[in-house]
Amino acid sequence: MATEVVDVLVTGGKATAGPPLGPAVGPLGINIMNVVKEINEKTKDYAGMSVPVKVIVNTDDRSFEIEVGIPPTSALIKTELGLDKGSTEPKAIVAGNLSMEQAVKIAKMKKDSMLSFTLKNATKEVIGTCVSTGINVEGMSPRDAQKAIDAGEFDEYFNE
């Protein structure tokens, strides 16, 4: 069984037969519209976000399987806050304020794809992404929020 794997980044629920999907999958001899339909069905919950998708094609019988990844942390943060984009000057301009509850929620979504062993450390990873997007956490800079987590100020969020 020979397989080909195509990795693409698509907008949730809005994949089309055009680039980047069409040119990558078309030469493999499978019905592109069936692929698009299945991708859109599986990514509809991530509407508007960039979602990593793997199309695994069995070149012998031309069957395919779709694996949907989790959107990048920055996309989840921006969606949670209702932002179109982060700050253009992260150190000078604040684009939004993430609550600790929202940070923990995103960490739980991403935990399986992160290197952290604990929810507390996964949340600190999410907050680290806030540094580059210009988003504060609980009204403080992301670095200060990470220090506050280390000091135990938000331990009530990590009791599982």
From Swiss-Prot:
Keywords of the record: Ribonucleoprotein, Ribosomal protein, RNA-binding, rRNA-binding
Q: Could you tell me which HAMAP family the record lists for this protein?
A: Ribosomal_uL11
The molecule here is called Large ribosomal subunit protein uL11
GO biological-process terms attached to the record: translation
Q: Which family does it belong to?
A: Belongs to the universal ribosomal protein uL11 family.
GO cellular component annotations, sorted alphabetically? large ribosomal subunit
Question: What subunit structure does UniProt give?
Answer: Part of the ribosomal stalk of the 50S ribosomal subunit. Interacts with L10 and the large rRNA to form the base of the stalk. L10 forms an elongated spine to which L12 dimers bind in a sequential fashion forming a multimeric L10(L12)X complex.
Q: What does this protein do?
A: Forms part of the ribosomal stalk which helps the ribosome interact with GTP-bound translation factors.
Report the NCBIfam families cross-referenced here: PRK01143.1
Name one molecular function that GO assigns to this entry.
large ribosomal subunit rRNA binding
Tell me any Pfam family this protein matches.
Ribosomal_L11
At the top level, the lineage of the source is Archaea
Q: Which organism is it from?
A: Methanococcus aeolicus (strain ATCC BAA-1280 / DSM 17508 / OCM 812 / Nankai-3)
Q: Has keyword Signal?
A: no
Give the matching PANTHER family.
60S RIBOSOMAL PROTEIN L12 (PTHR11661), LARGE RIBOSOMAL SUBUNIT PROTEIN UL11M (PTHR11661:SF1)
Q: Which InterPro entries match?
A: Ribosomal_uL11, Ribosomal_uL11_C, Ribosomal_uL11_C_sf, Ribosomal_uL11_N, Ribosomal_uL11_N_sf
The answer to whether keyword Ribonucleoprotein applies is: yes
